[in-house]
Amino acid sequence: MINEIKKDAQERMEKSVEALKNNLLKIRTGRAHPSLLSGLSVEYYGARTPINQVANIIAEDSRTLAITVFDKELAGLVEKAIMMSDLGLNPMSAGTVIRVPLPPLTEERRKSLVKIVRGEAENGRVAVRNIRRDANGDIKALLKDKEISEDDDRRTQDEIQKLTDIAVKNIDDVLAVKEKELMEV
């Protein structure tokens, strides 16, 4: 029972770190990366469809994304979706290929992105701490039902705390890498 609780907590903490990494991929740095457009979608046959399902997105160079639309009619919709997003990008269309040059980030924009990234990291830490709280609550319930001893309770809480510390350190490492990436000129 204790091992199941620890394993569940560890898996959920790892998922929280992965979710943070995925969220940070969508935040624009100075470099072109296809995941930058992963949050955008277009109206396609009456349904909202992610851009990466109706087009091929590649990084042409470090400052340009190239989007090859599968259906020529969608080129205008994809271009409009990119312009309407809060990414501050101006796509240029040439038939079925849309080029999206990424302007260099201003110092002010970099600092605001760092604040956003720190907020995301803090949300990740809070999620990990909530997982720890849930796991410790489950352990306390076992102790209350006399299914485990107080020694087992204390030892398990210490082990869960170690898992929490590892997850928070991973979040801090991911944050440091992203901040460094954002502040590079």
Curated annotation (Swiss-Prot):
Superkingdom is Bacteria
Which terms are listed as keywords in the entry? Cytoplasm, Protein biosynthesis
Check the record and name the PANTHER family matching this protein: MITOCHONDRIAL RIBOSOME RECYCLING FACTOR PSEUDO 1 (PTHR20982:SF3), RIBOSOME RECYCLING FACTOR (PTHR20982)
Localisation: Cytoplasm
Q: Which family does it belong to?
A: Belongs to the RRF family.
Please identify the protein, giving its name as recorded: Ribosome-recycling factor
One GO biological process term is: cytoplasmic translational termination
- Say which species the protein is native to: Aliivibrio salmonicida (strain LFI1238)
Q: Which GO terms describe its cellular component?
A: cytosol
Q: Nucleus as a keyword?
A: no
